[in-house]
């Protein structure tokens, strides 16, 4: 059977979207509960948010043949998604908001569109770096900072292993 184009595929997309939205919503609720002085309730919202994240991951994997695609594919997908958001979605939302008299919301849609444009550019640059083998080496000297311990190295390449905490090159 072919999943593509089926009602089950639509259901998987709906389930993924619903679980993803619930995760964010529960994270916001946890923050508010904590601010309101309810640590136990915040912890329960956070636990449930993590459960929802895992549920979303199940559906996302199923939509992608059972696994999460590789990093180059993910970078391209992310860039394409950001492109749609800033060139189409938010432009249309801003136009509608203006037509309906929601000027503040139109301004916010336009502002977020500009951020999404930057996101697209960042993802495309990262993809270019991955495809060109330039993630951990550059033409000129660069500051490389270990994301684990904060150690700084200046040079053309990130060290294979951090000389301070022994974390691998992937942390630079």
Question: Model segments located where?
Answer:
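Non-heme di-metal
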Residues: 1-172
């Amino acid at each position: 059977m072919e999943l593509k184009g089926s009602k089950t595929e639509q259901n998987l997309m709906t389930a993924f979207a619903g679980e993803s939205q619930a995760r964010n919503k529960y994270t916001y609720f946890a923050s508010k509960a904590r601010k309101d002085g309810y640590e136990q309730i915040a912890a329960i919202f956070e636990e449930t948010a993590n459960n929802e994240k895992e549920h979303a991951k199940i559906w996302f994997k199923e939509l992608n043949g059972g696994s999460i695609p590789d990093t180059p594919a993910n970078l391209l997908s992310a860039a394409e998604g950001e492109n749609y958001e800033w060139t189409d979605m938010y432009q249309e939302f801003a136009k509608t908001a203006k037509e309906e008299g929601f000027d503040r919301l139109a301004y916010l849609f336009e502002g977020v569109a500009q951020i999404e444009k930057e996101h697209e550019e960042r993802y495309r640059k990262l993809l270019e770096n991955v495809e060109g083998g330039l993630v951990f080496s550059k033409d000129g000297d660069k500051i490389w900072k270990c994301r684990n311990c904060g150690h700084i190295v200046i040079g053309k390449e990130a060290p294979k292993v951090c000389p301070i905490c022994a974390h691998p090159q992937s942390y630079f």
